[in-house]
From Swiss-Prot:
Primary gene name: xseA
Protein's UniProt keywords contain Repeat: no
EC number: 3.1.11.6
Record-given protein name: Exodeoxyribonuclease 7 large subunit
Family, per entry: Belongs to the XseA family.
Length: 401
């Protein structure tokens, strides 16, 4: 047989089919019954999803199935979300599942996922557009049932923690036909009249059907359009609604929403309390220091006479030491002066005269005559003795040669 030029290999055909399938079934939601379920040691789940007329092999990798709140079982009706892939080695289609829910809430979940995908694509869930709550709101708008537990929980918290806050309730139905429209109108009315600084929109817990009004598109768009920051407080912590995703802030319960409203006020009060404690501590420390100084001054003022007596004794001791030093100094000076006088007297000419010697002065020049050859007969001289003097005339000169 002739091989046509238009033929393709098996692998080529399979990979062409793989591209077609994976490009066109990127995200699908499939309902069916679990069959042939297995969970090997790898941690991945392998199974088939079937109905009365067909079945599709499925896989849920460990990174996805660890988030499940239940374990799939054979015969369980489920809603699977994921993508369709083609396994080339066996030429088999398979559903790569990234999320799974029991089919008991499947129809609700399907609607939830469709709206969630739509609004997410429009940017209603973007974190960047969400606003901060006012730190010190004065008026709180509440959109909920006037008879439910939610409003009582909110009021109890605000009374206990938010002294001076005003609460405006817009009573609405929170479940059943028309509830979503009432909730959306209440949010719009608060914005139209500018009556509140922050809105709490929510209700107490219930079944998925009971909470469904907060998954309606009309409520989501009203929350998104609100110029007033919105806190969504629907059901319990495990319940997540479309309103939670759109709101500026999600609270797990209505009571928690009220706590968030007064959080800024509480933080300010804690900050003020901290400052007061610091100031009180500093004042106590300062007062203690001043008290110590005052006690010291009191102790010093308590015995001024003792201080004066002590100072007088010190002064008297200094005076005695000074006079003693002066006497010793004067005595040493007197001794040195007496010794010097004795030495001076021994060297004085008068001492020599006392021993019988005399000094001859020339009457003409008033100088001492040390050599007889300087005199001639007839010269007048003055002779000085130890006591007194005489004048004489030289009669004869003996040169003493």
């Amino acid at each position: 047989m002739n091989i046509s030029e238009g033929t393709v290999s098996v692998s080529r055909l399979v990979y062409l089919l793989k591209e077609v399938v994976e490009d066109n079934f990127v995200q699908v939601l499939v309902t069916g019954e679990i069959a042939n379920f297995s969970a090997p040691s790898s941690g991945h789940y392998y199974f088939a999803v079937k109905d009365d007329q067909a079945q599709l092999r499925g896989v849920m990798f460990r990174s996805s199935n660890r988030l499940l709140k239940f374990t799939p079982e054979n015969g369980m009706q489920v809603l699977c979300g994921g993508r369709v892939s083609l396994y080339p080695q066996r030429g088999e289609l398979q559903l790569v599942v990234d999320r799974m829910e029991p089919l008991g809430v499947g129809s609700w979940q399907l609607a939830f996922e469709k709206l969630k995908t739509k609004l997410d694509a429009e940017g209603l869930f973007e974190v960047g557009r969400k606003r901060r709550l006012p730190s010190f709101p004065r008026t709180i708008g509440v959109v909920t049932s006037p008879t439910g537990a939610a409003i009582h929980d909110i009021l109890n918290v605000l009374r206990r923690r938010g002294a001076g806050l005003h609460v405006l309730l817009s009573p609405v139905r929170v479940q059943g036909d028309g509830a979503a429209d009432e909730i959306a109108r209440a949010i719009a009315d608060f914005n139209r009249h500018g009556q509140a600084d922050v809105l709490i929109v929510g209700r107490g817990g219930g079944s998925p059907e009971d909470l469904w009004a907060f998954n309606e598109e009309v409520v989501a768009r009203a929350v998104f359009a609100s110029r007033i920051p919105v806190i969504s407080a629907v059901g319990h912590e495990v319940d997540v609604t479309i309103s939670d995703l759109v709101a500026d802030l999600r609270a797990p319960t209505p009571s928690a929403a009220a706590e968030l409203v007064v959080q800024g006020r509480q933080e300010l009060e804690r900050h003020v309390d901290h400052l007061v404690m610091r100031l009180s501590g500093q004042m106590q420390g300062r007062l203690s220091l001043l008290k110590e100084r005052l006690d010291g001054l009191r102790r010093r003022l308590r015995s001024p006479v003792d201080d004066l007596r002590r100072q007088y004794r010190d002064l008297e001791q200094l005076r005695k030491r000074l006079f003693s030093a002066m006497e010793k100094t004067m005595q040493r000076a007197a001794n040195r002066l007496g010794l010097a006088g004795s030495r001076l007297h021994a060297l004085s000419p008068l001492a020599t005269l006392d021993r019988g010697y005399a000094i001859v002065f020339s009457a003409k020049t008033s100088t001492i005559v040390r050599d007889a050859r300087t005199l001639t007969p007839g010269d007048r001289v003055q002779i000085r003795f130890a006591k007194g003097s005489v004048e004489a005339t030289v009669d004869e000169v003996d040169h003493g040669d």
